[in-house]
Amino acid sequence: MHEVGLFVDLNSFTQLILTLFFVSIGLLYFVKRTAAKYFEVGGGSGGFDRDHRRDFMVSDTAECSVCGKATTKKCSRCKSVRYCSAACQTSDWKSGHKLKCKGFRSTDSSPVRRDDIDFEASLFGNRSASKKTRIALVPQQSQSKATLKPTDVLFPYESFVRYYNWDRPIMAPCGLTNCGNSCFANVVLQCLSWTRPLVAYLLERGHKRECRRNDWCFLCEFENHLDRANYSRFPFSPMNIISRLPNIGGNLGYGRQEDAHELMRFAIDMMQSVCLDEFGGEKVVPPRAQETTLIQYIFGGLLQSQVQCTACSNVSDQYENMMDLTVEIHGDAVSLEECLDQFTAKEWLQGDNLYKCDRCDDYVKACKRLSIRCAPNILTIALKRFQGGRFGKLNKRISFPETFDLGPYMSGGGEGSDVYKLYAVIVHLDMLNASFFGHYICYVKDFRGNWYRIDDSEVEKVELEDVLSQRAYMLLYSRVQPRPSNLRSEESQDEKKTDTLNTESNQDGSVESSGVGTNDTSVSSLCNGIISHSEDPEYEKESSLSASVPVSEEGKEVDVKVDTVDSESNRSIDMEHDSGTDHQEEEANGKEDPTVENLAVDSSCLDITTPSPSAATEFIPQENERSDTESKPLEKEHSDTESNKPLEKEHLDSESKPLEKEHSDTEMIDAQ
C-alpha cells in the first residue's frame, strides 16, 4: 500500500524562506526611507518627545505653578500650566516657560507684532467653574503694513542692536543626524544657529506670527529648528528643512552632495525675501527700504568697484550689495590677510581688456580696484578651494586669525571699529583633492565662548588652537561692536564738514576740484541701515576732476559746493576745449579768478576714494594747454538749474601778465 503525500525539497524550502526574509527586510527599509521624507526620523527624536511631553505634564490639581494657590486659569497656549494672576504668569514665562510652550501656541491668521503683546489675566469671577477661564495672550492686531512710504524703515536699527548684544546664555550645541548626504546642510544650519542677532530675534520675538506666507517658510521652519535644538539633549533630524531644499535653492536636491557655500547664499537670500514678503514683496517695497530689513542688517555690506581712466582721469565708482566675500587663494597667499590683499589689489585694464571710458568715448587703459565700502555686521568669507576638474580642489592651508581687522581693506580707511571675532568655521574633508565628493564638518563658538567640533550628530568640545589649525572653507566673523546706526544727522555733519574744508581751502588760495567728496558723503548713508540709491539700479556714480565755478565778486567769499559731473557734461567740455574757444580773465586783489581746464593726473593709478588736501597740487596740465602768457580759461555755459561747481586754481608763471577784463562777471560768452 502506497502512502500519499507532498514531496518537499529541503534545500528549495530553505532558499524560499531566506528569500522571503530578505525581501521583507528590503521592503521595510524602503518604507522607512519613504516615510523619512515626510516624517521626522532618527534616534534622538523619541528622546526629545519624551522630554518635551514630560516638561508639560501637570497634575490634575488646579494649583498655580508659581505660588501653589488654587486657580482655574490656564496658559492659553499649552493649556497645561495654571496661573492665579498675571504676575505669576509673567514670572513663569521669564523663567523659561515661554520658549517651552511656543510649539503649542495658537496659530493666528492675522499678522501681529509681539512687541505689542500685553499679557493680562482674564478674571471672570461670576462665571461657572465648569467653563475654562484662560489668560489672554493674543495681542491686538497691529496696523497694516501694506502702505509704505519711500523713507520707511522696515526694521528699526535700534532693535537690531539690542538683538546683536543679546547675552542670554543657551545650552551647548546639539548634533544633527545625517539624513543621507546632508552634511552640507547640517553645517550651514549649525552656523546659522550660532549667529547671535538672528537667534535672538527668532527666540525672543519670533517670526511665525508676522509671517504672511501661505506656503512653506524657511524662517518659520528655522524658528522651530532653534526651539528644538535649544531644549533637545539628543541629536535630532532636520528633515523638515532638508526635504525642502528645492524651495530654498532651485538647483539643490535632497540626497545629493551639494556645496555648503551655495546653500548658505540661498538661505540668506530666502530669508531676505521672507522679510520683504511681510511688506508686500520685492516689487512693492522701494529699493531704499529693502536695505533696512533684519537680514540686511546682519549680513549685508557694500562693495565698491572703482575704475580710473589714465587718459582723462575720469573716475567711475560702482557699488554692489554683498552678503559674503569670496576670495581667491591662488599664488603665494598663505594667510587670510594676503588673500584679501589680492582681492583689493589694483588691476590694470589693458591689452584685450581695455576700459570703455564714457568721457573719452573710446577704449582706453584704466586702473580698477575693489574695496569694501561698508563692512557688514556678520562677515562671511568663502575661500575658493574648488577649481575646475574632478580633482581640482586646493588643499593648501590658509591661516586665519581669531581677531580680524577689516580696516585696511575698506575704501575709506575704515571707521576704526571694523574689528571682528571668529565664531564659526566650515571645513571640507576629501580624499585625493577630489571636488566631487567629501564630507563637511564645522566648528562653532557658543555664546559663552566655548568652541565645539560638530560632525553631524557628534559634538565634541575643543580648544581654539584646534580651530585655527584647520584648512577652512568658510569663515564667519562677527563685529566686536555693531555698525553705528545710520542717522541723517551724521550725513548732514559730513556735508557740513566738507563745506567747511572747502571754505578754508578758498581762504588759503588753494581751492580743490574733486567729485569724490560728494560721492563719499552720499554713500555714507549706505554703510549703516538706510541706503540712498541713485536712479541707477546698479548704484553707479561717476565723478570728474573737471568742473566750472562762478566768478566771485570782490570782497566776497567763493561758495564752493562739491558735486558730481556726469559723462555727458564732461564730453561737452572736452569738445568746447578742443574747438579753441577762449574767454577772458581778470585780476582782483592780486588773485586770479577761478578757471576751469581739463587736467590729467599722472599715469599711476591714484586712490581717489580718500583724497587729501594736497592731492590737488599734483595735477599736471595736458599737452594741448596753451602757454602761461597765451592761455585763456574756458568757462562752461551755465544752464538754468546749474549749481556751483568746485574749482581748481590755475598755476600761472610769475612772469605772465594777467589780461584786462573785457566783459562783466555775469556776462556769458557763446562757446559756439
Curated annotation (Swiss-Prot):
One of its GO terms (cellular component) is membrane. Residues 174-480 form the USP domain. Residues 484-672 are annotated as: Disordered. The active site is at 183 (nucleophile), 439 (proton acceptor). A zinc finger (MYND-type) spans 64-101. CDD domains: Peptidase_C19E. Zn(2+) 2 binds at residues 75, 78, 97, 101. GO terms for molecular function: cysteine-type deubiquitinase activity; zinc ion binding. Residues 500-527, 606-615 have a biased composition (Polar residues). Belongs to the peptidase C19 family. Recognizes and hydrolyzes the peptide bond at the C-terminal Gly of ubiquitin. Involved in the processing of poly-ubiquitin precursors as well as that of ubiquitinated proteins. This is Ubiquitin carboxyl-terminal hydrolase 19.
